[in-house]
UniProtKB/Swiss-Prot annotation:
Domain of life: Eukaryota
Family statement drawn from the similarity comment of this UniProt entry: Belongs to the ectatomin family. Ectatomin-Et subfamily.
Name under which the protein is recorded: U1-ectatotoxin-Et1b subunit A
Lineage of the species this protein comes from: Eukaryota, Metazoa, Ecdysozoa, Arthropoda, Hexapoda
GO MF entries: monoatomic ion channel activity; toxin activity
Tissue note: Expressed by the venom gland.
Amino acid sequence: GVKEKLLAVLRKACPVIEKLAKKCHGTVATLKKACSLIH
C-alpha cells in the first residue's frame, strides 16, 4: 500500500537525513524523530 511505500522511502532517506541533521536543525530534527519511530 501507499503507507508501506512511504515507509520504504523514509528508510532509505534516513541516513541522508541524519547527515543533514548534523548541519541543520529544526525541520531535520523532526524528520529524524520520524525516522527513529520507523526503525
